[in-house]
Amino acid sequence: MKKNLMLIFGGVSFEHEISLRSAYGIYSSLLKLDKYNVFSVFVDKVTGIWYLLDSVPSSAELIKRHTTSIVNFIPGCGIFVNNKSLEIDVIFPIIHGRTGEDGAIQGFVKMMDIPCVGAGILGSAISINKYFCKVLLKSFNIPVVSFIGFKKDDYILNKEGIKEDINNKLNYPVIVKPSVLGSSIGINVAYNVSQIEKYIEEAFEYDLTVVVEKFIKAREIECAVIGNDQIKIFTPGEIVVQDFIFYDYDAKYSTVPGDSIVFNIPAHLDMKHLLDIKEYAFLTYKYLELRGMARIDFLISKDTNLLYVNEVNTIPGFTDISMFAKMCEHDGLSYESLVDKLITLAFESYKKRKDKIDFTRLES
């Protein structure tokens, strides 16, 4: 008997359009698997309203919003559309960035008591926050590039002091990032003090916390990881960027792989780097309490050959050019099998939690 799966995509997020592309790929795979009844739920970018669609369309222009298809969630009661109950066995969120990748939807689904694909509340919330993620990894002696972080209120009160810290502790050039955002949105490289203020202000347009890191010329390595208690680390891949300073938003989504962007799977690594990447991927996954899946990004300095953990993505892209599925496929796990495996992991994680915790103690 087929399970009822709800695929949630879109979202009130700067990465809304990327989510649509990822959802289309996953939806197509679910149709090929023919193991699930798929309920496609689109979250409007402006209003945040959830709509049940007939399918995941290939482009945003084809999405139709009907008031009769609005999805309502009532914890303890169920999911309803037009006063009709939906029996959902598992939820697959593919909203990138805020509300989808930051623990919000994970907490909501947990309140609904439904298995959910991917990381839980804690792992999602820490991983998406570049500042706290780096602080935590550094505390476990996992190498990260030198950085400082600060909130908008602190910057307003001590602008010159923070700029002085950037100059003294990091030295230029530096890379300026919003703390909670993905897909390289709002990221800029500042080469001198005259640029830093402009880029900090721009980063604050996306988040209330900014991270400034020492900019290094580096090889960009990505590593796919799946699993719960037992994890599998796939062969790392490398993104070779020719015409961009780093792998920014335009390079990721506005450029067709070719002369400017080359994906090497496997990445050309010496044995030490390969083993270190797999070890740090394992430890990062463990310390952040991740489950389901993650893409862990690394940097290898072209000057010093040193390795750093860069960022962690708990809902990596599933578009036709995304590296996550390609790395899994290289090691023999097809796109369709990957999607199916992630759903299985969601059921396993849910069952373990139910078996481990005696919920009868809550009964009066």
Curated annotation (Swiss-Prot):
Annotated metabolic or biological route of this protein: Cell wall biogenesis; peptidoglycan biosynthesis
UniProt cofactor(s) = Mg(2+); Mn(2+)
**Residues annotated to bind ATP:** 167-222
Task: Indicate the segments forming the ATP-grasp domain, all copies.
Answer: 134-344
* GO cellular component assignments: cytosol
Function per UniProt:
Cell wall formation.
Source organism: Borrelia duttonii (strain Ly)
First-level EC class:
ligase
Similarity field: Belongs to the D-alanine--D-alanine ligase family.
What does the entry's cofactor note say about binding and number?
Answer: Binds 2 magnesium or manganese ions per subunit.
Q: Where does Mg(2+) 1 bind?
A: 297, 311
Instruction: Name the UniProt key words of this record, in alphabetical order.
Output: ATP-binding, Cell shape, Cell wall biogenesis/degradation, Cytoplasm, Ligase, Magnesium, Manganese, Metal-binding, Nucleotide-binding, Peptidoglycan synthesis
Q: Where is this protein localized, as stated in its record?
A: Cytoplasm
**What GO molecular functions are on record for this protein?**
ATP binding; D-alanine-D-alanine ligase activity; metal ion binding
Q: What reaction gets catalysed by this protein? A: 2 D-alanine + ATP = D-alanyl-D-alanine + ADP + phosphate + H(+)
According to its UniProt entry, the protein's GO biological process terms are:
cell wall organization; peptidoglycan biosynthetic process; regulation of cell shape
- PROSITE patterns xrefs: ATP_GRASP (PS50975), DALA_DALA_LIGASE_1 (PS00843), DALA_DALA_LIGASE_2 (PS00844)
The protein in question is named D-alanine--D-alanine ligase
* Residues that coordinate or bind Mg(2+) 2: 311, 313
